[in-house]
Amino acid sequence: MNIKPEEITSIIRQQIENFNTNIETIDSGTIIQIGDGIARVYGLEDCMEGELIEFPNDVYGMALNLEQDNVGCVLLGSEEGIKEGNVVKRTKKVVEVPVGEALVGRVVNSLGMPIDGKGPVLTTETRDVEVPAPGVIDRQSVKEPLQTGIKAIDSMIPIGKGQRELIIGDRQTGKTAIAMDTILNQKGKDVICIYVAIGQKQSTVAHIVNDLTKMGAMDYTIVVSSTASDSAPLQYLAPYAGCSMGEYFMHKGKDVLIVYDDLSKHAVAYRTMSLLLRRPPGREAYPGDVFYLHSRLLERSARLSEKLGGGSLTALPIVETLAGDVTAYIPTNVISITDGQIFLESELFNAGQRPAVNAGISVSRVGGNAQIKAMKQVAGTLRLELAQYRELAAFSQFGSDLDKESVKRLEKGKRLVEILKQPQYGPMPVEKEIIILYAAVSNHLIDIPVNKIKEFEKELFNYIDTHYRDIGKDILEHKQLTDELKSKLDKAINDFKNVFLSEI
């Protein structure tokens, strides 16, 4: 057998030419401890804080503790089948969620995966979960109102687009109801709403989604749900994921409303993670950076400058108190971060005043600039008159004789309190709020019996819609009560009052 050296040479040359020199380097580590949804990994030398780590069984984790000899990761899925000695890999990416129009009308989890059984979310765009908040130059002041449709709030504690307004109160005082009514009131106003449920019962979230669907509000709403059965890391991520979804629309120049329900459970989830990661506990066993946990989330709400499109992200964080104690750690933290708070009281709620807003300690620090002039005109003295009424009501319980002026104030106060009551799922257009508040403040209701006020209000709107339809249009158009408009309103109210009183 003749072996020709030229043939061997050509074969070797061909092999060398076809040899692929692609070398793939994978930064990997080894699990040295796992349990309670926390994994400690040896290796991963150049790992970033918040980086996604790939575990076996298609489970991902997030690196949170970067220590000298190991990395502490929280698992974003089940730890079943993962054991010590398994190899994990770096992805060199941080946690991101899908964003875009395709999410509107859907119910998703903290990672943006659909959980409503309506198929995949058809979007290719993603956004990091943790994004720095816009700087001072990138913002403009809050000057446009975001109407909640709730008389007590729009008049005394107004909310502007780009504001952070805390809703705080004990359990079962109607906190979620206020947030829901605000979402319902955005119908037809080109506002995208995001409801983030953190640590809620699955049945509660299903009930909320059902109500939103029934009222036609899911057409402009995204629900991000991380229920009580989800792991602490998923509950921790939920508000940041919802915020990133909202920021996508904000940077497109749209107005967004986001509700975090609630941040007390969010802080508890973060405390759970921190204690399992062996971070030192502080006050109430929360870690030292629990203030930063919420401040970096809420600072992302803003009204962007015109140069950046003028979009806005308005936040309504909810915090639950225990026995009305607003001096606890999380409530004081969030009060100091937000631009005001709506305080709900169990006593008022149980006494039948719903929404149970305590106007005395509720405040909106920036919303006043956003209020339309007509509302300022009717609501200017409202808070003071209510405060005087409460003082007089407490004083009159001692049965002492009151002068005529005090009796008059008491009677007016009773009617104001009655006017501010409102049923759930009954948000009111701003022009109707102004009409009825004008009637109350201008002493038009003083001769209407208190138990007939609700009936009077309902029938007054029907009467105005039939006989004085242009009043509402004029209020929306001029955004202030001119002398001409006031006299027209006086005439309409008096005309109807005569009819109403004759029928009683």
UniProtKB/Swiss-Prot annotation:
Q: Which SUPFAM superfamilies match?
A: C-terminal domain of alpha and beta subunits of F1 ATP synthase (SSF47917), N-terminal domain of alpha and beta subunits of F1 ATP synthase (SSF50615), P-loop containing nucleoside triphosphate hydrolases (SSF52540)
What's its membrane topology? Peripheral membrane protein
Q: Which CDD domains match?
A: ATP-synt_F1_alpha_C (cd18113), ATP-synt_F1_alpha_N (cd18116), F1-ATPase_alpha_CD (cd01132)
As for subcellular location, the record says:
Cell membrane
InterPro entries from the entry?
A: ATP_synth_asu-like_sf, ATP_synth_asu_C, ATP_synth_asu_C_sf, ATP_synth_F1_a_nt-bd_dom, ATP_synth_F1_asu, ATPase_a/bsu_AS, ATPase_F1/V1/A1_a/bsu_N, ATPase_F1/V1/A1_a/bsu_N_sf
The EC number(s) given in the record are 7.1.2.2
Keyword annotations for this protein? ATP synthesis, ATP-binding, Cell membrane, CF(1), Hydrogen ion transport, Ion transport, Membrane, Nucleotide-binding, Translocase, Transport
What is this enzyme's catalytic activity, as reactions?
ATP + H2O + 4 H(+)(in) = ADP + phosphate + 5 H(+)(out)
Q: Which positions bind ATP? A: G169, D170, R171, Q172, T173, G174, K175, T176
A GO cellular component annotation here is: proton-transporting ATP synthase complex
The principal location of this protein is: membrane
- Keyword Metal-binding attached: no
Taxonomically, which superkingdom? Bacteria
Required for activity (site feature) positions: S362
Q: Write one Pfam family the protein is assigned to.
A: ATP-synt_ab_N
> Under the GO molecular function aspect, what terms does this record hold?
ADP binding; ATP binding; proton-transporting ATP synthase activity, rotational mechanism
Assigned protein family:
Belongs to the ATPase alpha/beta chains family.
- So what does this one do? Produces ATP from ADP in the presence of a proton gradient across the membrane. The alpha chain is a regulatory subunit.
Question: What quaternary structure, including any partners, is listed in this protein's UniProt entry?
Answer: F-type ATPases have 2 components, CF(1) - the catalytic core - and CF(0) - the membrane proton channel. CF(1) has five subunits: alpha(3), beta(3), gamma(1), delta(1), epsilon(1). CF(0) has three main subunits: a(1), b(2) and c(9-12). The alpha and beta chains form an alternating ring which encloses part of the gamma chain. CF(1) is attached to CF(0) by a central stalk formed by the gamma and epsilon chains, while a peripheral stalk is formed by the delta and b chains.
Protein name (database record): ATP synthase subunit alpha
Say which species the protein is native to. Answer: Clostridium botulinum (strain Loch Maree / Type A3)
